[in-house]
């Protein structure tokens, strides 16, 4: 049995077609349940799927005597008490790099928004002040992304995806 703490509609988006053929019972936590209540009602679950911000500590693990694995549906697992899992012989897994591409795109969007006064510019257009905003932007001598040097701390999946995209802008790239 797999107990899924996230909502079914989100899970179904990523669920592979062959999943229906697997001899596994999927149970989804009801929105009105706490994680502990869901664990108590599904004490025979051997695996739980959680999102990156679900707190999974001894209070949940102790309700699941058959638990063998906690799987984060994302990259993060910092809300899972890994020490408590280790003490109980429970594996903790994540989806390394699964969202690197979308995080890289989001990162570059934020860079462009900052360089191009995205939010103030949007607000100025709504208020009919786009000419005044244009003058402020020009006076600020804001560089284009191609004129920037970008430093990436670490060079894992997300940084590599970001670097690939930034290369097309022509900026200088550095990583540590």
Regions found by a protein language model. Name each.
Residues 1-47:
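N-terminal glycine-/charge-rich "phosphate-binding" loop or analogous flexible N-terminal tail
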Residues 4, 150-152:
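Hydrophobic Val/Ile/Leu positions in short beta-strands of Rossmann-like dinucleotide-binding domains
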Residues 168-176:
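NAD(P)-binding Rossmann-fold cofactor-contacting core
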Residues 54-67:
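Rossmann-fold NAD(P) dinucleotide-binding segment
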Residues 158:
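Hydrophobic/small residue at the entry helix of a nucleotide-binding pocket
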Residues 30, 51, 73-74, 90-101:
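Short beta->alpha connector loops at strand-helix junctions that form conserved
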Residues 88, 95-149, 161:
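Phosphate-binding beta-alpha-beta segment of Rossmann-like dinucleotide-binding domains, i.e.
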Residues 78-90:
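Rossmann-fold NAD(P)-binding glycine/threonine-rich loop
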